Amino acid sequence: MTTLELHNGSLREPIPKELLGSAVLDRTGDFEAGSYQSFTLTYTAGRFGIDDSGSIRVVFRFATDQTNPQFDDPTAPGFTEVVASNNAVLQVRFDPKGNIRPWDRTLQIKVVKGFMKEGDTITVRFGVTDHGGAGMRLQTFCEGRYEFRVLVDPIATYNFQTLPEQPAISIIPGM
């Protein structure tokens, strides 16, 4: 193997999908288009945990009019809280163009102090209503399978891999 092949800036072999961890939603099923809802997504770290400066992303399709996650006003729609089970310090940001299309609407969660070991969790509460907020407004059009797609970069190489099973809901017409 040449030096160029060894250090070409790409991960030669991805981590096997079954070792990446898992993500689940607290609620699944049918939800009315345009309604305000709250969801808790829990990511459980896989075999390699998440290194200091590793990240997860929760991404959504670009064609949506849902409320963006926000972290500043707990009384406003879309208020989102993120916490690590082991008290690792997390940096959280929303970037509407933070991933490749069509999954470019990105909530990025980076471990900035500490690390996650296998079995540790990151809990994301979308549409928190505890402080008077309305929740997260779902998109106003129907979608049979609406994913909260989770990607993970466990070893901090900026090589985000898609989890093998994705949390999803169904967005249906109003009643």
Placement of each model-derived feature along the sequence:
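Ser/Thr/Pro/Gly-rich, low-complexity intrinsically disordered stalk/linker tracts of secreted
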Residues: 1-175
